[in-house]
A protein has these predicted regions:
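Conserved N-terminal beta-strand and adjoining loop/helix that marks the start
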Residues: 1-24, 75, 90-93
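A generic structural micro-feature
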Residues: 6-10, 37, 82-88, 106-109
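A conserved beta-turn-beta hairpin within the catalytic core of GNAT-like acetyltransferases
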Residues: 32-38
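The catalytic Nudix box helix
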Residues: 40-72, 92
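NUDIX/MutT-family hydrolases
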Residues: 91-93, 102-136
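Acidic/histidine-enriched, glycine/proline-rich intrinsically disordered or flexible terminal extensions
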Residues: 138-148
């Protein structure tokens, strides 16, 4: 067991798969824990906010893209031991509705690109690595295949 870092708590992060044409949107993180790694858009759950509302808000804030059909995908338990952070990441699935992705928060992301599970960029953000090892990963892959 890892001892609790003084004053640290567990936060809830939301990762959002945006499906379009058999691919999903990913960005390279910047300026925060996991800088230089790749993940889907996302952010923190705010007080009183639903997972779905967080997904819609974060994708719009970060990329300008509108999403719909937002649904639960998976959950991972992510401990960043070197940084003294602990997150529960709720992975949401969604469909692209409108807009071309643009980096709207350049202090948090260096680039956006559409990927599929056969061409994942490296290195992946820790919660992504956890997701790939989870029993939920195959179900998310099936969702993407069904969206083609």
């Amino acid at each position: 067991m890892i001892s609790n870092v003084a004053g640290a708590g567990v936060r809830v992060g939301i990762g959002v798969f945006v499906f379009r044409g058999g691919r999903f949107l990913m960005g390279c993180r910047r300026g925060a824990h996991g800088a230089g790694t790749w993940s889907v858009p996302g952010g923190h759950l705010e007080f009183g906010e639903s997972f779905e509302d967080t997904a819609v808000r974060e994708v719009a804030e970060e990329t300008g893209v509108q999403i719909g059909n937002v649904r639960f995908g998976a959950v991972t338990n992510d401990v960043f031991t070197g940084e003294g952070r602990h997150y529960v990441t709720v992975w949401m699935l969604s469909d692209h509705v409108a807009g071309e992705p643009v980096v709207l928060e350049p202090d948090k992301c260096t680039g956006l690109a559409w990927h599929d599970f056969d061409d994942l960029p490296e290195p992946l953000f820790l919660p992504w690595r956890q997701l790939v090892r989870s029993p939920h990963f195959d179900a998310i892959r099936r969702e993407l295949s069904a969206a083609r």
